[in-house]
Amino acid sequence: MKGSVMSLSMYQASAPVFVAMLNNLAAILEKAEAYAKERKIDESVLLNWRFAPDMFPLTRQVQIATDFAKGTTARLAGVDVPKYADDEASFAALRQRIAKTLTFVEAFRPADIDGSEGRDITLTAGSRELNFKGQTYLLRFALPNFYFHVTTAYDLLRACGVGIGKMDYIGAI
């Protein structure tokens, strides 16, 4: 409709997006585990795969994706970000981490996150302090980083020969 304006809330642009993509990532990891078992490949080979020496391996890509999902929803809602040990060493453990993250993110309701567009968000990245307003944090920092790490995890597994495709990444529509 010409001239119509679409309204998208902070909640709609965050929690359901994280939930959908994390569910897709969990399914991709399940396929990767089956692939490794079928071919008698030690799963640590896939979990430690990286594209370049200075890039994180698959395990860390998944950990960072879950960190962005839980951290973003928590910060937008103004609650503490849960800390995870980052000690996953199997596909099953990574899927457990995703499940724990899904439980956390799914607990938020629209009222918890909506209205956070102007919330002050401060992060520490190495020795730098990053300051954002909620909407800029979500749209220009958190979502791009989340998608980067989910996509990199997908690409690493695809490059290793795991039989996954675009619909595995996108998921059910």
What are these regions (language model features)?
Residues R158-I173:
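C-terminal end-helix/capping segment
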Residues S7-A20, D42-A65, A85-L94, G126-N145, ...:
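Alpha-helical scaffold segments that form or flank carboxylate-/histidine-based iron centers
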Residues D54-V81, T101, E106-F108:
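Conserved alpha-helical segments that form or flank metal/cofactor-binding pockets of metalloenzymes
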Residues M1-V5:
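Short, Lys/Arg-enriched N-terminal segments with co-localized hydrophobic residues
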Residues L22, A26-E33, K70-T73, A99-E106, ...:
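Structural signal for well-ordered, non-membrane alpha-helices
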Residues A36-I41, V81, A125:
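Conserved, structured C-terminal
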Residues A36, E43, D112, I164-K166:
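Residue-level detector of short coil/turn "hinge" positions at structural boundaries
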Residues D86-L157:
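Acidic/histidine-rich alpha-helical segments that form the ligand environment
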